[in-house]
């Protein structure tokens, strides 16, 4: 029988990304959850795409999302579902903006 993986977000290994943002991840066999905190000097998560399904939810602050050419402002408890291979970017609109992202399959690049 497989066991549950209990964790505390603040105890997950922190990885510095972009200029001064922080990424923490936890994985299961097929899925990944990332906890992303925009740093005070990070002005944008540049436009990119990947083969993973992604669902993101704002948990603190607000963010301007551009997904497939469509722009929306997301506030706390609002989110977006991004299909695979669709270009997207995120711009934090408040200091300390945080998001939780769910990925399928696991993003191996986030584990490095």
Which residues does each PLM region occupy?
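Structural motif
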Residues: 32, 42, 62-64, 87, ...
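Short acidic-glycine-tyrosine-enriched beta hairpin
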Residues: 70-84
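Ligand-binding loop in jelly-roll beta-barrel domains
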Residues: 84-109
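Short strand-coil-strand connectors
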Residues: 29, 66-70
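A short, N-terminal "cap"/entry segment at the start of jelly-roll beta-barrel domains
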Residues: 1-30, 112
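Conserved short histidine dyad/triad with adjacent acidic residue
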Residues: 19, 34-49
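Short, conserved beta-strand element in jelly-roll/cupin
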Residues: 38-39, 49-65
């Amino acid at each position: 029988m497989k066991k549950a993986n209990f964790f505390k977000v603040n105890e997950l290994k922190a990885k510095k990304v972009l200029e001064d943002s922080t990424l923490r991840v936890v994985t299961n066999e097929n899925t990944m959850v990332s906890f992303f905190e925009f740093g005070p000097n990070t002005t944008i998560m540049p436009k990119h795409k990947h083969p993973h399904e992604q669902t993101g939810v704002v948990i603190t602050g607000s963010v301007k999302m551009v997904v497939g050419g469509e722009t929306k402002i997301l506030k706390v408890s609002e989110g977006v579902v991004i299909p695979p291979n669709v270009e997207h970017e995120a711009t934090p609109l408040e200091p300390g903006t945080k998001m939780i992202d769910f990925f399928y399959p696991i993003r191996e690049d986030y584990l490095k």
